[in-house]
Regions:
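Nucleotide/phosphate-binding catalytic cleft detector across ATP-hydrolyzing
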Residues: 1-77, 97-98, 121, 134-160, ...
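Residue-level signature of catalytic and energy-coupling elements of molecular machines
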Residues: 47, 114, 174
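Gly/Thr-rich phosphate-binding beta-strand-loop-beta motif of the actin/hexokinase/Hsp70
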Residues: 69-99, 114
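Short glycine-rich, Thr/Ser-proximal phosphate-binding strand/loop in the N-terminal lobe
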Residues: 96-113, 118
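A general structural motif
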Residues: 166-175
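Phosphate/pyrophosphate-binding loops at sites that engage ATP/ADP/AMP, CoA/4′-phosphopantetheine
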Residues: 175-181
Protein backbone atom coordinates (compact mmCIF):
# COMPACT_ATOMS: atom_id res chain seq x y z
CA UNK A 1 0.00 0.00 0.00
CA UNK A 2 1.19 3.53 -0.68
CA UNK A 3 0.05 6.33 1.61
CA UNK A 4 0.63 10.01 0.91
CA UNK A 5 2.23 11.78 3.86
CA UNK A 6 2.13 15.33 2.52
CA UNK A 7 2.04 17.50 -0.57
CA UNK A 8 3.98 20.56 -1.71
CA UNK A 9 2.73 22.87 -4.45
CA UNK A 10 5.41 24.72 -6.43
CA UNK A 11 8.06 23.67 -3.90
CA UNK A 12 6.19 25.39 -1.06
CA UNK A 13 5.46 24.14 2.43
CA UNK A 14 4.11 20.66 2.99
CA UNK A 15 0.32 20.52 3.30
CA UNK A 16 -2.08 17.70 4.13
CA UNK A 17 -4.55 18.20 1.27
CA UNK A 18 -3.84 19.92 -2.06
CA UNK A 19 -7.46 19.98 -3.25
CA UNK A 20 -8.59 23.44 -4.30
CA UNK A 21 -5.03 24.76 -4.69
CA UNK A 22 -3.44 25.69 -7.98
CA UNK A 23 0.15 25.51 -9.14
CA UNK A 24 2.47 24.16 -11.80
CA UNK A 25 4.29 21.56 -9.74
CA UNK A 26 2.93 19.05 -7.21
CA UNK A 27 5.35 17.06 -5.07
CA UNK A 28 4.10 14.12 -3.03
CA UNK A 29 5.87 12.59 -0.05
CA UNK A 30 4.63 9.08 0.57
CA UNK A 31 5.21 5.99 2.67
CA UNK A 32 5.23 2.49 1.15
CA UNK A 33 3.93 -0.45 3.20
CA UNK A 34 4.64 -4.04 2.22
CA UNK A 35 3.01 -7.24 3.46
CA UNK A 36 3.51 -10.95 2.91
CA UNK A 37 0.69 -12.10 0.59
CA UNK A 38 0.67 -15.68 1.92
CA UNK A 39 0.38 -14.42 5.50
CA UNK A 40 -2.57 -12.19 4.60
CA UNK A 41 -4.23 -15.04 2.69
CA UNK A 42 -3.90 -17.29 5.77
CA UNK A 43 -5.41 -14.64 8.03
CA UNK A 44 -8.24 -14.06 5.54
CA UNK A 45 -8.93 -17.79 5.47
CA UNK A 46 -9.18 -17.86 9.25
CA UNK A 47 -11.69 -15.01 9.28
CA UNK A 48 -13.75 -16.58 6.50
CA UNK A 49 -13.64 -19.93 8.28
CA UNK A 50 -15.10 -18.14 11.32
CA UNK A 51 -17.97 -16.78 9.22
CA UNK A 52 -16.64 -13.24 8.81
CA UNK A 53 -16.83 -12.03 5.20
CA UNK A 54 -15.82 -8.85 3.33
CA UNK A 55 -12.29 -8.68 4.72
CA UNK A 56 -9.89 -5.99 3.59
CA UNK A 57 -6.33 -5.49 4.82
CA UNK A 58 -4.69 -2.11 5.40
CA UNK A 59 -1.58 -1.01 7.22
CA UNK A 60 -2.57 0.19 10.70
CA UNK A 61 -1.82 3.76 9.67
CA UNK A 62 -4.35 3.64 6.83
CA UNK A 63 -6.92 1.82 8.94
CA UNK A 64 -6.71 4.41 11.68
CA UNK A 65 -6.85 7.23 9.12
CA UNK A 66 -9.97 5.69 7.61
CA UNK A 67 -11.44 5.24 11.06
CA UNK A 68 -10.85 8.89 11.85
CA UNK A 69 -13.06 9.79 8.88
CA UNK A 70 -15.95 7.78 10.27
CA UNK A 71 -18.50 10.49 9.53
CA UNK A 72 -18.35 9.50 5.85
CA UNK A 73 -18.66 5.79 6.62
CA UNK A 74 -21.86 4.40 5.15
CA UNK A 75 -21.92 1.32 7.37
CA UNK A 76 -20.99 0.39 10.90
CA UNK A 77 -17.58 -1.23 11.09
CA UNK A 78 -14.99 -2.76 13.37
CA UNK A 79 -11.28 -2.05 13.30
CA UNK A 80 -9.21 -5.04 14.46
CA UNK A 81 -5.48 -4.53 15.04
CA UNK A 82 -3.63 -7.81 15.56
CA UNK A 83 -0.53 -6.56 17.35
CA UNK A 84 2.46 -8.42 18.72
CA UNK A 85 1.58 -7.80 22.36
CA UNK A 86 -2.19 -7.40 22.14
CA UNK A 87 -5.27 -7.20 19.96
CA UNK A 88 -7.28 -3.98 19.72
CA UNK A 89 -10.93 -4.04 18.67
CA UNK A 90 -12.51 -0.67 17.89
CA UNK A 91 -16.19 -0.53 16.89
CA UNK A 92 -17.85 2.38 15.08
CA UNK A 93 -21.60 2.91 14.68
CA UNK A 94 -23.40 5.81 13.00
CA UNK A 95 -20.13 7.61 12.37
CA UNK A 96 -19.04 7.52 15.99
CA UNK A 97 -16.73 5.44 18.14
CA UNK A 98 -18.98 3.16 20.15
CA UNK A 99 -16.75 0.58 21.77
CA UNK A 100 -13.07 -0.12 22.24
CA UNK A 101 -11.41 -3.18 23.78
CA UNK A 102 -7.84 -4.32 24.24
CA UNK A 103 -7.14 -8.04 24.51
CA UNK A 104 -3.78 -8.48 26.27
CA UNK A 105 -2.64 -11.40 24.15
CA UNK A 106 -1.09 -10.85 20.74
CA UNK A 107 0.50 -12.64 17.83
CA UNK A 108 3.87 -12.81 19.58
CA UNK A 109 2.39 -15.70 21.53
CA UNK A 110 2.71 -17.74 18.33
CA UNK A 111 6.49 -17.49 18.77
CA UNK A 112 6.35 -18.59 22.41
CA UNK A 113 3.96 -21.44 21.57
CA UNK A 114 6.34 -22.61 18.84
CA UNK A 115 9.25 -22.40 21.29
CA UNK A 116 7.42 -24.57 23.80
CA UNK A 117 6.04 -27.08 21.30
CA UNK A 118 9.37 -27.83 19.65
CA UNK A 119 11.91 -26.89 22.37
CA UNK A 120 13.37 -24.04 20.30
CA UNK A 121 14.94 -20.69 21.06
CA UNK A 122 12.85 -17.57 20.51
CA UNK A 123 14.89 -16.70 17.41
CA UNK A 124 14.45 -20.15 15.89
CA UNK A 125 10.71 -20.11 16.55
CA UNK A 126 10.30 -16.64 15.04
CA UNK A 127 12.35 -17.56 11.98
CA UNK A 128 10.30 -20.72 11.41
CA UNK A 129 7.05 -18.77 11.73
CA UNK A 130 8.15 -16.11 9.26
CA UNK A 131 9.69 -18.46 6.70
CA UNK A 132 7.29 -21.41 6.81
CA UNK A 133 4.34 -20.56 9.00
CA UNK A 134 0.79 -21.15 7.82
CA UNK A 135 -2.32 -20.47 9.83
CA UNK A 136 -4.48 -23.19 8.27
CA UNK A 137 -3.35 -26.77 8.75
CA UNK A 138 -5.97 -28.04 6.29
CA UNK A 139 -4.29 -26.31 3.31
CA UNK A 140 -0.72 -26.97 4.46
CA UNK A 141 1.24 -29.35 2.26
CA UNK A 142 3.24 -31.51 4.62
CA UNK A 143 6.99 -31.32 4.22
CA UNK A 144 10.08 -31.39 6.37
CA UNK A 145 11.19 -27.95 7.55
CA UNK A 146 14.78 -27.30 8.59
CA UNK A 147 15.05 -25.92 12.11
CA UNK A 148 17.33 -22.86 11.91
CA UNK A 149 20.91 -23.36 13.11
CA UNK A 150 20.49 -27.14 13.56
CA UNK A 151 20.44 -30.28 11.44
CA UNK A 152 17.00 -31.14 12.73
CA UNK A 153 13.66 -30.87 10.93
CA UNK A 154 10.00 -30.75 11.83
CA UNK A 155 6.81 -31.38 9.91
CA UNK A 156 5.17 -28.32 8.37
CA UNK A 157 1.73 -29.56 9.48
CA UNK A 158 2.92 -29.71 13.09
CA UNK A 159 4.03 -26.08 12.86
CA UNK A 160 0.72 -25.14 11.21
CA UNK A 161 -1.19 -26.86 14.03
CA UNK A 162 0.57 -24.72 16.65
CA UNK A 163 0.03 -21.51 14.66
CA UNK A 164 -3.61 -22.29 13.83
CA UNK A 165 -4.45 -23.06 17.46
CA UNK A 166 -3.18 -19.69 18.68
CA UNK A 167 -4.72 -17.78 15.75
CA UNK A 168 -8.09 -19.38 16.47
CA UNK A 169 -7.82 -18.33 20.11
CA UNK A 170 -7.00 -14.75 19.11
CA UNK A 171 -9.91 -14.64 16.66
CA UNK A 172 -12.29 -16.12 19.23
CA UNK A 173 -11.47 -13.14 21.45
CA UNK A 174 -12.19 -10.76 18.58
CA UNK A 175 -15.45 -12.53 17.72
CA UNK A 176 -16.52 -12.40 21.38
CA UNK A 177 -15.97 -8.62 21.39
CA UNK A 178 -17.93 -8.26 18.12
CA UNK A 179 -20.80 -10.28 19.57
CA UNK A 180 -20.93 -7.93 22.57
CA UNK A 181 -21.57 -5.11 20.15
Amino acid sequence: DILPVGYAIDRGEMIADPLGRSGRNLEVTYQVYLADYDYLADIQGLFEGSGIQEIEFYPAVRAYAEALDVERAERDFALVDLGAMGVNVVLFRDGMLEYEAHLPIGVRTIDTDTMAAFALSFGQARKLKHEYGQALRSICKNKKLPIPDTRLTLESRDLATVIQSRCEELLEGVIFQLQQW
